[in-house]
Amino acid sequence: MEYDPLLSRTLNRDPHLGSFAHILSRRNSNIRETERRLTAGQTGLENFSAGHEFFGLHYRKGGWVFREWAPNADRIYLIGNFCGWKEDERYALRRIDASEGVWEIRLPEKTLQHQDLYRLRVHWPGGSGDRIPAYARRVVQDRHTQIFNAQLWRPENPYEWKHPVPSAESLESLHIYEAHVGMAQEEPKIGTYLEFTKKVLPRIIRAGYDTVQLMAIQEHPYYGSFGYQVSNFFAACSRFGTPDELKALVDAAHEAGLRVIMDLIHSHAVSNEVEGLSRFDGTTYQFFHEGPRGHHATWNSRCFNYGKYQVLHFLLSNCRFWLDEYRFDGFRFDGVTSMLYIDHGLGKAFTSYHDYFNDNVDEDALVYLALANKVIHSVRPDAVTIAEDMSGMPGLAAPVNEGGYGFDYRFAMGVPDLWIRMIKEIPDEHWPIGHLWYELNNRRPEEKTISYAESHDQALVGDQTLIFRLIGADMYDHMHAEDDLLRVNRGIALHKMIRLITLATAGHGYLNFMGNEFGHPEWIDFPREGNGWSHDYARRQWGLADNPDLKYHFLADFDRKMIGISDQFRLLAVPEVHLLREHAEDKVLAFERAGLLFVFNFHPFQSHPDYRFRAPEGEYRVILDTDSPIFGGHGRLQPDECHFTFSPPPDPHDPVLSLYLPSRSAFVMERVTGRAFRQERRM
């Protein structure tokens, strides 16, 4: 059977896909056919994804118009402080499209004012309930009653954007700083957009990262959900501040040349009915699958039916909304694995290609993800999309027309698991260097990946950050700069080495969760009944990194230098990594990338004098040393020391380097010239 030439290119790159070519072809056809059906062959996806400009509350031609989709409803009232929160026929919506279930009301301008609260009272056969509009752009919670309502946001002086988005030329690689606005503050409280802009954004800029990934932006009723139980998909989280304050945050980041991407939660929705979409019109199936498939048992949330026209309209419009309204520069799609598989991939190892091409795959979800990427890149060609998938689904970060699903990047989610296993289960002297190298570089070459040693996942309560796994409770008593405890020294050394080799072998991007760059202690535990609603573990102790008398600043300084070198030498823009030396017993790895030489000695106590390995001919200068005293090391190498390759007999054309490799350390060398030391040396 012949396939589309572009699909054939994918099959040629990965022969294992050949047995499933007919499924790939069918999925690709489904994407094209769904796009044709949604756009009716006339308007493009960019127009189709403008549902947020039709539904919801809008000021149009001197008055207000509100529309909602509720096909099972038989009566809907707009209620709020403008009508004493009572049903009033003056505020009754009328059904304007019986077949589609679209409702509308038009009101004079004077009816509604800035910051008015409102909601819907929806009646359906056999029942009724209050609901927050599905397209509400601002939702607030009353501090006393804890009740959520939609709020009209129409200030007299709306926010005016001051700075352009970063240029497309800066997109060749990503250094991502993952952050949560609410827990970004030092004080034990919920932080705000304004505080983040003033206090945290400058730290990110100084640290050298070029992209901020903001978590928990979509409105969510329960703060402790980390933002993953979304109720109002078009509303920015109000507990952090106003829409204008979020825009100012994004604008300030753009002024500094930073991209801002956000976590986009389209994998599920909160099960709350009043605040969320569940049983919005009295049915369980309006937005979600009916029956057990519509409920995520592990997350206690609702699962979207990606095969429904109006669900696609809602979610695709949501993608466009955040680009248009808040000028976000892209998205990290959360929970993609849960979307892809009917069983959500729970408890599966994904050891065979058959796992990606059987009846357990939700092909409607694949179609949605492909169309979402098409919408995003149509609205903003330079936008960044990242897939969080732990299953390894082939093609997620491949072009749609080549049988992929259009993401720009995918997370290398096996890397943090690798580090946890090695630290937790294997003594240092038995670390499998060959396996380490394989896993760090195990990725589909045609798909861009983002690596990380740890993210927010590893910092949550019940888990441990890398630094805490390495040092443990000694962090509380032995992090003074002059303290010389062996366990602490080991932890600091490995923390730097782990992060350096993860970045140096990353595909096209690197991610760090806020605070991990300086070894922030302890896990994250949001306020909850079990901890007395305390914020003590839902904050960042920046003062630890600012204190010169503590060791934390060594890690922060090292990370800043490491990120700076990666940016200066465009490390992640050069995907090729060339292995020069791998030795299991010596615990040595040496490799070249972007003209830089990376040398690692993971041996816990054995230093290697006069250690030789082949390298590109030239003169090399050390530009980063994990063992430098300025980074809390022992200073066993000479700063800025230069080394020349030489060609020992019998082959004068086979240059080698001879280096001193201190134990449990790593360094980076820049090739400053192609000039070698020509005099032959004795072996």
Segments (PLM) and residue ranges:
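The feature marks proteins involved in alpha-glucan
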Residues: 1-61, 65, 86-88, 92-178, ...
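Substrate-binding/active-site clefts of carbohydrate-active enzymes
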Residues: 140, 158, 162-174, 180-361, ...
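Conserved alpha/beta catalytic core and glycan-binding cleft of carbohydrate-active enzymes
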Residues: 144-148, 327-329, 347-538, 567-612, ...
